[in-house]
Amino acid sequence: MSKAPRHFLDLLDMSTGELRAILDASVAMKKRRKEGLIADKPLAGKTLAMIFDKPSTRTRVSFDVGMRQLGGEAIMLTGAEMQLGRGETIADTAKVLSRFVDIIMIRILSHDALTELAAHATVPVINGLTRRSHPCQVMADVMTFEEHRGPIEGRTVAWTGDDNNVLASWAHAAERFSFNLNVATPQELAPNKPLKDWIRSSGASIRLGTDPEAAVRGADCIVTDTWVSMGDKDGEHRHNLLRPYQVNAELMRLAKSDALFMHCLPAHRGEEVTDEVIDGPQSVVFDEAENRLHAQKGILAWCLGAGG
């Protein structure tokens, strides 16, 4: 009987030990790459299928380059080409792709489509992003924090903005990696009920509130994201609600003097963050972007049993 594939769908699906093994492998791969040691090709002969229902820059390039650096190949399939769930069923798509490729990464708004694909695939499936969660991004974020400030355990991360997929994965990471997460959102844009219920039952050190100053006070890191995400409506109303949550120099001064600033990009400068902050010495946004490549290499290797 064949082994069940190692999927990477959500941080809560894996143990802390498994997530730490992925990060350790990612750090080691980055170090070897920086030292010019590029002969190691653990995924030689392997093919990654990348499925996108929306255009993507960072996710597409980082997975494509990452797979190539590990010795494998990547092919891209768009929503228009796939008609995922509109023509051939998701289940049949999963079964067919599993006969052609060794691993699948999908970036799709519907989390249910992701889980259905994984349920029927006989090869590993990676969550490249859904409306519910963005685990690859937060693995890169944790890696970035630890590069600059050491172990994240026991530290405090502050989120200011609204409820979205990145926040959900930060909450999951807080539970798995044992750090404190302070969340500040407008009441109208507070975490959704399933996430709020999970936070209450998880025992994680996560504090929900509406005051951005209280959330960031004494924090080791401040994180934000765009105010209007893919598919969001009522942009003007959201902007009015979120304007007090902008990360600016005044807000940064309430955090620790060496606090990091993170943003998964693309950023809308002058909205959720000022130029002064995102271009300032505490900003590590481009390290985060680079670490998407390295963290995802660790994830690819783990899923295919070549590391971790």
Swiss-Prot record:
Q: What GO terms in the biological process aspect are recorded for it?
A: arginine biosynthetic process via ornithine; citrulline biosynthetic process; L-arginine biosynthetic process
Q: Is Transferase among this UniProt entry's keywords?
A: yes
Output the SUPFAM superfamilies linked to this UniProt entry.
Answer: Aspartate/ornithine carbamoyltransferase
Q: Where in the cell is it found?
A: Cytoplasm
- Extract the Gene3D superfamilies matched here: Aspartate/ornithine carbamoyltransferase
Instruction: Look up the record and report any one GO term of the cellular component aspect.
Output: cytoplasm
Q: What is its main location?
A: cytoplasm
One Pfam entry name: OTCace
InterPro entries in the record, alphabetically?
Asp/Orn_carbamoyltranf_P-bd, Asp/Orn_carbamoylTrfase, Asp/Orn_carbamoylTrfase_sf, Asp_carbamoyltransf_Asp/Orn-bd, Orn/put_carbamltrans, OTCase_ArgI
List keywords of the entry alphabetically: Amino-acid biosynthesis, Arginine biosynthesis, Cytoplasm, Transferase
For this protein, the Enzyme Commission number is: 2.1.3.3
Gene Ontology molecular-function annotations: amino acid binding; ornithine carbamoyltransferase activity
Pathway noted in the entry:
Amino-acid biosynthesis; L-arginine biosynthesis; L-arginine from L-ornithine and carbamoyl phosphate: step 1/3
This chain's function reads: Reversibly catalyzes the transfer of the carbamoyl group from carbamoyl phosphate (CP) to the N(epsilon) atom of ornithine (ORN) to produce L-citrulline.
Protein name from the UniProt record: Ornithine carbamoyltransferase
